[in-house]
């Protein structure tokens, strides 16, 4: 991976945040996004493809009104990033437990009708995935090397378990979405830093 690639942030920022750190498991779905496999069996994600998919996802999400976008994270380290993403972009976030029926039961007080959903991890956010499928809304998901993507419409390959990795990816997705929406100029500084999206450190 060359330092001179035209990336959204310098390559070292991706690496420092651990965006490239996959798992020791891989699925056939995620093989195209794996850069190499280390001697210890850890699969390394190609951050150029992460970068490319963040741009594609931002472009895709910009076709919707922000109040039609739902972002979800059952994962602890994804809860602050999805909350900050929603704050920055005007979307809706569900950090923590996703109550069954949120998308499928109009009788439920917390019932929502988004037009598109963003998942932090298709496995951890399985309830949201199943409900989004059942009501027929597109699914964007952050996918690690061990995820299956058959039910995902747009996968963003990334470490979807790490605190700093999730913060950086959601920060970039928010920034690029605002640019696509014309709410942030191309050369304008984003009012948030990636650190603002970071969840609390381990206790």
Curated annotation (Swiss-Prot):
The keyword Ribonucleoprotein applies. GO terms for cellular component: small ribosomal subunit. Gene3D superfamilies: Glucose-6-phosphate isomerase like protein, domain 1. One of its GO terms (molecular function) is structural constituent of ribosome. InterPro entries: Ribosomal_uS2 (IPR001865), Ribosomal_uS2_arc (IPR023454), Ribosomal_uS2_bac/mit/plastid (IPR005706), Ribosomal_uS2_CS (IPR018130), Ribosomal_uS2_euk/arc (IPR005707), Ribosomal_uS2_flav_dom_sf (IPR023591). One of its GO terms (biological process) is translation. PROSITE patterns: RIBOSOMAL_S2_1, RIBOSOMAL_S2_2. Keywords: Ribonucleoprotein, Ribosomal protein. Belongs to the universal ribosomal protein uS2 family. NCBIfam families: uS2_euk_arch (TIGR01012). This is Small ribosomal subunit protein uS2.
